């Protein structure tokens, strides 16, 4: 059935919208992943963004800098692709993340509060394969990026979303609801090497949970098990999953 074909693609888009899994439904031709640069990465000599001006949106583990672009290389099922992340409309209490995939552009509004950063809605997307995607956030729980003082080994926090969704495939309009819950744990501080360079202290966050979707009578529960590495004053440098349902790796290539 058509809905069965659309569902796996849509599930991946939801994960990408949360910035936790990056799989473009129409990726670039198969090519080997970028070879990591063995040279040490340049470490910031001073804070690259203004703490006073950013207010509650200041967080060195997810630095918000307008005019900068984080470029990532992605590999999913041996297929390579790219992602560029930038920020706009930055205020002391909110900002917008712009994610540019080869065939998808998303914009996600975030809010900042005393507990950390939270994307208060799913992305408004421009998708060639699935036009007119509409998300309505029904409920949000927890934060995605906790405050700086919480970044210690052993710290755990939960994130959850309940959403309604509507999109078009061909001449068919699909409607459904999703429930996504994950538990995040800072498990270690360890060295890591990615295409952008080598970092001696990367905070490894292990994430586990489930995404339950019901679209036009088709129901599915997708287990989410992946790991993200953050470097202070750089942000996310790697995000990866070995789960056969959503298998991918995303690594920072440059920050320009």
Segments the model singles out, each with a brief description of its role:
Residues 40-256:
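Conserved functional acidic sites
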Residues 18-22:
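C-terminal motif of bacterial Sec signal peptides marking the signal peptidase cleavage site
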Residues 24-26:
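Bacterial signal peptide processing site
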Residues 1-10:
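Bacterial N-terminal signal peptides that target proteins for export
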């Amino acid at each position: 059935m058509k809905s069965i074909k659309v569902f796996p693609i849509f599930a991946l888009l939801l994960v990408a919208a949360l910035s936790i899994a990056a799989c473009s439904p129409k990726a670039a031709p198969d090519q080997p992943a970028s070879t990591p640069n063995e040279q040490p990465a340049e470490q910031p000599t001073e804070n690259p963004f203004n703490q006073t001006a950013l207010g509650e949106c200041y967080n060195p583990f997810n630095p918000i800098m307008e005019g900068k672009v984080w470029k990532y290389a992605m590999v999913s099922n041996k297929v390579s692709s790219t992602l560029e992340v930038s920020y706009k409309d930055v205020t002391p209490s909110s900002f917008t993340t712009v994610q540019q995939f080869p065939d998808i552009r998303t914009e996600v509004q975030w809010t900042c509060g005393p507990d950390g950063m939270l994307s208060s809605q799913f992305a408004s997307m421009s998708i060639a394969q699935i036009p007119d995607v509409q998300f309505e956030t029904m409920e949000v729980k927890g934060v995605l990026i906790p405050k700086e003082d919480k970044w210690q080994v052993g710290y755990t926090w939960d994130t959850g979303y309940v959403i309604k969704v509507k999109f078009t495939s061909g001449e068919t309009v699909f409607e459904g609801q999703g429930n996504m819950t994950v538990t995040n744990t800072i498990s270690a501080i360890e060295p890591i090497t990615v295409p952008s360079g080598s970092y001696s202290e990367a905070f490894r966050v292990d994430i586990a949970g489930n995404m339950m979707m019901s679209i036009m009578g088709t129901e599915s529960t997708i287990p989410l098990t992946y790991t993200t590495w953050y470097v202070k004053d750089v942000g996310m440098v790697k995000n990866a999953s070995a789960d056969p349902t959503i298998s991918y790796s995303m690594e920072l290539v440059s920050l320009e």
